[in-house]
């Protein structure tokens, strides 16, 4: 397990009956670019049970945050959804991914489009000051089934005060656009 750090759960937030997020400690050696993902999991017996998760916290924060859906029979999420403060998880020492600002050319508008927990990598991107140096306007479209699934709404509107948050709610044919 030398490729993994053991981290402690600091907090857990249940957004709905199907969505939750949690924060953990962060080993000082863990580096990532905003928008990347890493493998996280739990020790189950002698083997780690791992899945890829986008990092929702920004790379300058001293904690890690992850956003997840609750899958009742999911091998990992059925366990993660019961995390509590003080529990331990394992986090890969390496992050990866191409959904990073470095891979984009500067431009006028940056459109970030995600559904459900696909919002997670964009949470770190909109916290990145470089995003606003390279793009005049940031537009975030978050699609979900129900209004209550619009997780992180307050943080998003604080981060995008002059930019746009658009939500599309499929189960109720409801949408919101904030100029």
Language-model features and meaning:
Residues 2-85:
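Ferredoxin-reductase
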Residues 75-179:
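FNR/FR-type flavoprotein reductase catalytic core
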């Amino acid at each position: 397990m030398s490729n993994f750090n053991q981290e402690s759960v600091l907090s857990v937030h249940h957004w709905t009956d199907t969505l939750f997020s949690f924060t953990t400690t962060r080993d000082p050696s863990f580096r990532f670019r905003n928008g990347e993902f890493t493998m996280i999991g739990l020790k189950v017996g002698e083997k780690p049970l791992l899945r890829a998760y986008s990092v929702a916290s920004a790379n300058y924060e001293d904690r890690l945050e992850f956003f997840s859906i609750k899958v009742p029979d999911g091998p990992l999420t059925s366990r993660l959804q019961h995390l509590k403060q003080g529990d331990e998880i394992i986090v890969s020492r390496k992050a990866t991914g191409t959904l990073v600002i470095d891979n984009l050319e500067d431009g006028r508008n940056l459109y970030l489009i995600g559904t459900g927990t696909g919002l997670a990598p964009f949470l770190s991107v909109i916290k990145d000051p470089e995003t606003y140096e390279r793009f005049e306007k940031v537009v975030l479209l978050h699609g979900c089934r129900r209004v209550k699934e619009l997780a992180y709404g307050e943080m998003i509107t604080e981060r995008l005060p002059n930019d746009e948050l658009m939500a599309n709610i499929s189960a109720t044919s409801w949408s919101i656009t904030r100029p």
